Amino acid sequence: LAELSGFGISATGQIDTKEGVVSGTAGHIANWIQTPIAQIFKDSYHLPVSVVNDADCALMGECWLGAARGYRDVVMVTIGTGIGGGILTEGRLLTGVRGIAGELGHFPIRADGELCSCGNRGCYEKYASTTALVNMVRDRADELVPDISADHIDGQLIFNRVSQGDTALRSVVSEWITSITLGLVGLIHIFNPQLVLIGGGVSQQEDLFIEPLRKQIFSYTMPGFCKDLIIKSAQLGNNAGLLGAVAYLKNLF
């Protein structure tokens, strides 16, 4: 412990970064709200502690040592079981008044949409997450993948079949990409970033996902916002959050 200067913690949920406390979970994790993460570590180790949302940490990691290095205005969206993300503006992490800004999975894109775990309807992650894509295929499993049981359908299987020329699945993926696009275009029009960074396992599908997404984004975005706009995949994978937690502790962002 003598060599430690502090603890940088990447945590899931809505994190009050000022207090180091979990302030919300969007209905995902029982008994996590109001956990005083920072105080627990301070009481045990008597060292500085910072606690930040895991998606915000991923953004800071990528800005420090990854695909977003050198950029000062960045929107990052992580696509997986849900949707996470973070926003860097003029080189600083956007945290909001209580440190919980950037809950990108839970802005509604459909007023009469599906019920979300957060209690709202039509949330972005209900249509733009990998879970959403899997559910789209499962709902039509008898038609789209009659040789596979619904329980065995996942994102990897879907993209493998699209890469092998499955046009029906490609159409479903295109519809899903449009949902992702609509949310990202809104964020681009609000924040005017230099870079939109896409994280999550699906981000490694350059030809089947990133390139079609890029084309759709530029087709929907107003021309002035497209100037110098870059859209690309994150680089650091699961290490991004760990590196970002250290970066925040070191006051780099």
Question: Which residues are covered by each model-predicted region?
Answer:
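ATP-binding/phosphotransfer module of carbohydrate and carboxylate kinases, centering on a glycine-rich
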Residues: L1-G6, D16-V21, A38-L47, G61-Y71, ...
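Short glycine-rich anion-binding loops that position phosphate/pyrophosphate groups of nucleotides
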Residues: T12-I15, G80-G82, V202
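A charged helix-plus-loop insertion that forms the helical arch/lid used to bind
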Residues: G20-I33
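General beta-strand structural signal in soluble alpha/beta enzymes
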Residues: V49-N53
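Structural signature of FAD isoalloxazine-binding scaffolds in flavoprotein oxidoreductases
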Residues: I100-E103
